[in-house]
Amino acid sequence: QIKDLQEQIKRGRIMTVNGGYVYKANVVYSGVDLLGIDEIDIKTSTYRMDFYLWFRYRPNERDVDFKPDDFVFTNAEGEVEIAPIREETNADGTVLKTYRVSGTFKNQFRFYDYPFEHQDLIIEFRNQNATTSFIQYVVDRIGMRYESEEKLLGNYRENGAFSSIFGWQPQSARVDQDIFPTFSTFGNPQNFGRSVATNYSLINVNVDIQRDSLQYIVKSLLPLLITLILAYITFFLPLGHSERLAVGSTALLTTAFFHL
């Protein structure tokens, strides 16, 4: 049973087709232009992202609750700075809203292949109130010049997005559209008996980075190896007990220091 059927039809959310009723989803093109990545923290699996975010859509003046840019980040860690920088109407009647976004995000890192591992730096956002029946986010491939993952990575690189990360190398970038399901009833009695999820349209931005293994080996493993070799050589030198103990203690402390 559809709640407030006539009101939904009046707002343009539902239309009649062959005597039946169907939801009319509004397509909203969404794009992300990455400007910077820094503060990658492997202990907390967090990272800071700075980027432009925009929405392009055809307005629906009949529906006062039609708010395509009413979005929320699903993997934000703390407050996210969102600054509107542009709102304009294009010649074809579509509306463009652009934001500058900066904040810390989280995606659980995996270290199975350490120190040769890859990590995914992810940004996810969804519409906060409208389900997929009313609003569908679609990746704005044209606006992002997203011809391929390699092209998108190159665009981000030209923006200087990777100039502040050290010890990591970007490998690929992609943007996908998906759904965010929830089984919450939101306290609405109409949802108490529902066994299916409520779906919200979601955009996922994924930047794959790989640890710079050579840099890690030169800066971390090589000094340890040299220290251990020098400590081993002392066993073949004509040194007294106290001298050997001092060299061994120094090697042990040096090894512990490099693991801090």
For each predicted feature, which ranges?
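Channel- or pocket-lining gating/hinge segments that regulate access to a cavity or pore
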Residues: L202-L260
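Soluble non-transmembrane domains of integral membrane proteins
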Residues: Q1-N204
